[in-house]
Swiss-Prot record:
It comes from Paraburkholderia phytofirmans (strain DSM 17436 / LMG 22146 / PsJN) (Burkholderia phytofirmans). Keywords: Iron, Metal-binding. One of its GO terms (molecular function) is ferric iron binding. InterPro entries: CyaY, Frataxin/CyaY, Frataxin/CyaY_sf, Frataxin_CS. The gene is cyaY. The keyword Iron applies. This is Iron-sulfur cluster assembly protein CyaY. The keyword RNA-binding does not apply. Pfam families: Frataxin_Cyay. Signal peptide: none annotated.
Amino acid sequence: MSDSEYLTRAEAALAAIERALDDTDADIELERSGNVLTLEFENRTKIIVNLQPPMSEIWIAAKAGGFHFRFVDGEWRDTRSGTEFFAALSEYATQQAGEPVHFKA
């Protein structure tokens, strides 16, 4: 994948997260600084989602751990488990929010 393709796909993923948080009832604060999204929950825990252009990856740091995602067969997939990005982010956010939080592309 070219650098421009990566940036287009990765930016679309960040935009989808921003849209989902606009539509949720969960108390999650969102801050964006360049290629980094910080989601802060009511209990003061955070999830950090950041782009890693040199690796063509998106990384998530959550209470559950650190995870790397690459674009494979039309989806962002965890490089270790193969879990789809938005499913994983939904799971981590639900754990930290204490209520259902759903993200989708």
